[in-house]
Every structure is written in structure tokens, then in C-alpha cells.
Amino acid sequence: MGILPDNTHTLACDACTSWGMAGVITFGGSFPEYPGLDGLFWQMTWSEWKKVYQTPYLIPGKVIINVAEFLAALITYETFAKFCSHKTTTLRIDSRVAQAWLDSCRCPKHPFDRCAQAVHLHMLKRSAKFRTSWVPSGDNSLADNFSRERFSANSNGHVVSGQRFRKVKPTWNNVIKFL
């Protein structure tokens, strides 16, 4: 038993070398702020990311998958931080390398190591703790769907895997602070 109680919400993220990256929060039960929804998701293509920040690691056609998975996790943490304050929240990820980097708050690819430190500091300020859970790619289908196909900002939400999700804008202020 940790100091912070477990969160009923679950996070998941994924990256795809050909299309982009995404993250999702699945609500554990009803959430009054978002009635009728099972969760929220963000997604971004590599072309869209290139407009945010140009890096030799993540450009369309030259994506290093472990770095991409790591970045997707950091953006997922930051985007859904308000749902994770004062709780321990599980992040499902299908990259063992990115999982190890997240667990150690370190990444051997500069400048993403600095990004990780900024996001972890942001989480500490929110009294949020994350634990990673590796899942086989086949069991990460929800995040996989969002990282491989464009979904619009439909206010009614999108039904994916029998659940209703609404698209939100990703937050990356702490992620890109050191880029």
C-alpha cells in the first residue's frame, strides 16, 4: 500500500512509426464532468508534431519507436494530470524500453531526458504518482487505435472498443520546455 490511494482511472499510450502517437484515459466509473463518456483521448500525427518541435529523432519516416513511445507517455501524463492529482495512476504501455525510461525518469536520447525530468517535477507538484504496467501490443488496442487513425473532435464522442471517448487537445508545456 502506497502513500497515495490508487486511482480508478487508467492511462494508456502508444506510438506508431508511420502515423503518430496518442494517449487515453479510461474513467473508472461515471465522471460528472463528462457525462456519458468512458474516457478522453489525445492524438497527433508526426507531421503535426513537426510543427510543434523539429527533432532528428521524430520526423515523418524516421521515427525511433522507443523515443516515440516515451514521448507519448510524457504527453499523456501531462494531458491528463488533473485527473491524477493525489492518486497513484497506472499507465499501460507496450514498450519495455520506454517503460524502463519512465520508471527511472531517464532517457538516453537528449533532450528527452530533460523533458522527463520536467514532467516528473510537474507531477510531484500535483502530488501525482504513476506506475507503469507493460502490456503486450495486442492488449493495448485502445491506445493503438488512437495512434493509427485520425479521429475528429466530435462532441458526442467516438465509440471505440465498445466505449465512448472524446478527443481533447494534448498538453505538452512541460514536455517541450527543454526542447
For every predicted segment, state its role:
Residues M1-D6, K82:
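A short acidic-Thr-Gly-centered motif at the start of a beta-strand
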Residues G2-I3, C16, P60-I65, S104-F112, ...:
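Conserved, non-catalytic sequence blocks in retroelement Pol enzymes and Pol-derived host proteins
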Residues A72-Y77:
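Buried hydrophobic packing segments
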Residues D6-G20:
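Two-metal-ion RNase H-like nuclease active-site motif
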